[in-house]
Regions:
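Zn2+-dependent peptidoglycan hydrolase active-site motif and core
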Residues: 90-129, 156-160
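Conserved, short, structured surface segments that act as functional micro-motifs
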Residues: 110-114, 135-206
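Bacterial N-terminal signal peptides
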Residues: 9-17
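Bacterial N-terminal signal peptides that target proteins for export
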Residues: 1-9
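Short alpha-helix capping/helix-loop boundary micro-motifs
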Residues: 80-81, 128-131
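Short amphipathic beta-strand/extended segments with alternating polar/hydrophobic composition
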Residues: 50-52, 61-63, 122-125, 172-182
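Surface-exposed, glycine-biased beta-strand/turn segments
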Residues: 22-108, 139, 148, 188-236
């Protein structure tokens, strides 16, 4: 009898522990629900993957400055393309924000809410999108144009694309897990992110395209390493 009571106690404790634990990581969808934000295939004359999502070396160097709000990681993907390149909606949805610069990615941006509970965010646009809040859009519909955060169209024109939760827009997810594409091939050329920063005390963590941390805005820097590689000579 005592053994039986003990087993029930252990089971009850485990159930309570799991129910009380916050949900830190969202489940990646079994089938990727979104498409790429360009109608044309990738290539030198169309677009290339510039910087991936996650613990990139570029974000690590700026973890306490530019990427401090995003827990020290690059919380979207950058797709290099010429200014004016048409951007298409990655899925059916409804426009929720236009030029909401509190979300960053100037000079112009766009947020689309999708019925599956996620939102797509398009940043560094050439001009204010000609859409209105509440307007429905369909997957593949042109919604914006690629711009340049430096306003030159020669320094670093690119689309910054994010996947967020559509409720608070505070949680950001790895687009690689949500967008159907040959990411391994895309990562072979065009990258300006120089790969992922490595923690020599945990060298295998966050070293692959599909193994990167989710982000909670203003949740505290995730990648303060005692032994980083490459070394952080700047100390920023």
């Amino acid at each position: 009898m005592k053994a039986l009571v003990g087993r029930f106690t252990v089971v009850a404790f485990l159930l309570l522990a799991f129910s009380a634990s916050p949900r830190v990581r969202a489940e990646a969808p079994a089938e990727k629900p979104f498409g790429l934000p360009f109608a044309d295939p990738p290539g030198p004359g169309t677009w290339l993957l510039g910087q991936t999502y996650g613990n990139t070396t570029g974000a690590y160097r700026q973890r306490r400055t530019t990427y401090n709000a995003g827990q020290g990681v690059h919380f979207g993907i950058d797709l290099s393309a010429a200014c004016g390149t048409p951007i298409v909606a990655i899925g059916d949805g409804v426009v929720s924000k236009v030029d909401a610069l509190s979300h960053g990615s100037a000079p112009h941006n766009l947020m689309i809410d999708h019925p599956n509970g996620y939102a797509s965010f398009y940043g560094h646009l050439l001009e204010r999108p000609r859409l209105t809040v509440g307007q429905p859009v369909t997957r593949g519909e042109v919604v914006a144009k690629v711009g340049d955060p430096d306003l030159t169209c020669t320094s670093r024109p690119h689309l910054h694309l994010e996947i967020r939760d559509a409720e608070e827009y505070r949680h950001l997810y790895n687009p690689v897990l949500f967008i159907e594409a040959d990411w391994d091939s895309l990562a072979l050329v065009g990258s300006f992110g120089r790969g992922f920063e490595r923690d020599l005390d945990n060298p295998r963590r966050w070293q692959f395209l599909d193994d990167q941390p989710e982000v909670a805005l203003w949740g505290g820097v995730l990648n303060e390493y005692a032994r980083p590689w490459p070394p952080d000579w700047s100390g920023r």
